[in-house]
């Protein structure tokens, strides 16, 4: 298994992750909420900020899809504060790492770069695979996405913990 790497932070002791999908009402907010919780559990919330957005603007200001919210609630997460945002040029300057949920989102973001990756590049089971969009399917699709997101979030936290500069000059909390 290869170990995914992430770029060093632009500012020592501060790291910002942005998660991007199409409409910011299903996959990326699920990723944001789960990763933020894992970051908090790891004691990194003082150093790591997590946000999400969509490449399209259809849902800006809306809460997440009720099926995504239901899946999160059933796993013990609180989705109530999420409001959809659209990707804008400032996201590239403000985030140390942007994670696209699928290849189409990645293409909308200009393709891979040092700071733009696929979300599942950090998945030990299927590195580089897409997170399928559950929007046009049933509830099981949302639970499947949540399983993927949980797995990737654990890997990302481990990567954040070992990346020099994330938590300060030495990389230690």
Name what the model sees in each region.
Residues 2-93, 158-172:
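Conserved active-site segments centered on acidic
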Residues 29, 102-103:
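Alpha-helix N-cap/helix-start capping motif
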Residues 2-5, 97, 103-173:
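Phosphate-binding/catalytic loops
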